[in-house]
Amino acid sequence: MPKCYERGSNNKVNALSTHLQEKEEKILQVLECLAEESTKGTPIIVEGKNDIEALRALGIEGKIISAKTGGKSILDVISEVEKCTAKEIIILLDFDRRGKEWTKRLKQNLEYAKTKIDLTFWSRLFALVGTEVKDVDGLAS
């Protein structure tokens, strides 16, 4: 009989369950802070419509800008951000390779346009979900 089926081996299962619960709690804390910042008027840039819907489902009510809907270019997104007149903007694009590339490009271009960028939510969520979740709309599930 494999060791995992022996009596008392539930410790590993319980430890994993506890770890997953702690991870979920941390993700929820980050999302609560994100909702607070959004409520204060800090816009959030996401990739598309599904990401907006996911954030709305998670209770985020403030301004959310879609970076890739309707064939927008980076210049279109920058122009939309400048119209917001916000002191700071949160970038929360997907966690895949293309999302990382767009995040880098947006950050560079927006900083050049003298816009303060907040990547802390992206960094914290990526550290928590790693390769388990590839996109923002996956956070809602």
Write out the residue ranges for each language-model feature.
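Charged, low-complexity surface patches
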Residues: I44-I45, G99
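Phosphate-handling DNA/RNA-contact segment within nucleic-acid enzymes
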Residues: P2-G41, K49, E53, D76-V77
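N-terminal, charge-rich alpha-helical recognition modules
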Residues: E53, G59-G62
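Short active-site oxyanion
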Residues: S38-I44, G62-K63, E88-I89
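TOPRIM fold recognition
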Residues: P2-A15, A57-L58, A67-S141
